[in-house]
Amino acid sequence: MSFWVEVSLNTPAQLSLPLYLPDDETFASFWPGDNASLLAALQNVLRQEHSGYIYLWAREGAGRSHLLHAACAELSQRGDAVGYVPLDKRTWFVPEVLDGMEHLSLVCIDNIECVAGDELWEMAIFDLYNRILESGKTRLLITGDRPPRQLNLGLPDLASRLDWGQIYKLQPLSDEDKLQALQLRARLRGFELPEDVGRFLLKRLDREMRTLFMTLDQLDHASITAQRKLTIPFVKEILKL
């Protein structure tokens, strides 16, 4: 399942950036672990009526995109215009798609490390940042795989801008937190993940959360199809472990 976010901008080129975002990646489905202060800061920025900026960094798969999707979901459900720009998919669009985004309530730029060294993209992001500062109304959330000063950007002024606001590292989940996150995801999908099965998954699989969630979805589907509860023998059978 997913919700549709479309950003139609009043620019000379009338650029449109339509995207499907997963509707199961919300704040309610995010297990914070040691990231309670980060979660509170994000929600505070979304509640305020004026502009705010947060830079969030973590390794791939830690949940940074989940948080941006959650922010988009929260504001779009309030009827606010939002924009989500996944720079790991930058071949889908051009830097000019950022033109006019300072008129939105929220702009989320994901995976900024993907355009480090790209002069056109760096300048487009720098210009958007400055326009957002001038407007004083748009919330800006940016994610990367490292702190701003370590991004190897070709435009020093952009690195300086990114370093201005609140900067948070998304802390990795402990194994206990990963178990809680899996059980939360299962409950939200309408089934229970027994503790022994969850610990078995953590022991036998790649512990990267994206992989674990995909496996959980696979097991949910298999359980429904076979009309069997999740047990370790059943999981071994389905995953061929």
UniProtKB/Swiss-Prot annotation:
Against InterPro entries, the record matches this protein to: Chromosome_initiator_DnaA-like, DnaA_dom, Hda, Hda_Enterobact, Hda_lid, P-loop_NTPase
Biological process (GO) annotations held by this record are: DNA replication initiation; negative regulation of DNA-templated DNA replication initiation
Q: Which UniProt keywords apply?
A: DNA replication, DNA replication inhibitor
The regions listed as transmembrane in this protein's record are none
User: SUPFAM superfamilies this protein is in?
Assistant: P-loop containing nucleoside triphosphate hydrolases
Xref: Gene3D superfamilies: 1.10.8.60, P-loop containing nucleotide triphosphate hydrolases
Family that this chain belongs to: Belongs to the DnaA family. HdA subfamily.
Subunit-level organization: The active form seems to be an ADP-bound monomer. Forms the RIDA complex (regulatory inactivation of DnaA) of ATP-DnaA, ADP-Hda and the DNA-loaded beta sliding clamp (dnaN).
Q: Which HAMAP family match?
A: Hda
The record ties this protein, via PANTHER family, to: CHROMOSOMAL REPLICATION INITIATOR PROTEIN DNAA (PTHR30050), DNAA REGULATORY INACTIVATOR HDA (PTHR30050:SF5)
Describe its function. Mediates the interaction of DNA replication initiator protein DnaA with DNA polymerase subunit beta sliding clamp (dnaN). Stimulates hydrolysis of ATP-DnaA to ADP-DnaA, rendering DnaA inactive for reinitiation, a process called regulatory inhibition of DnaA or RIDA.
Q: What protein is this chain from?
A: DnaA regulatory inactivator Hda
Natural source organism: Salmonella paratyphi A (strain AKU_12601)
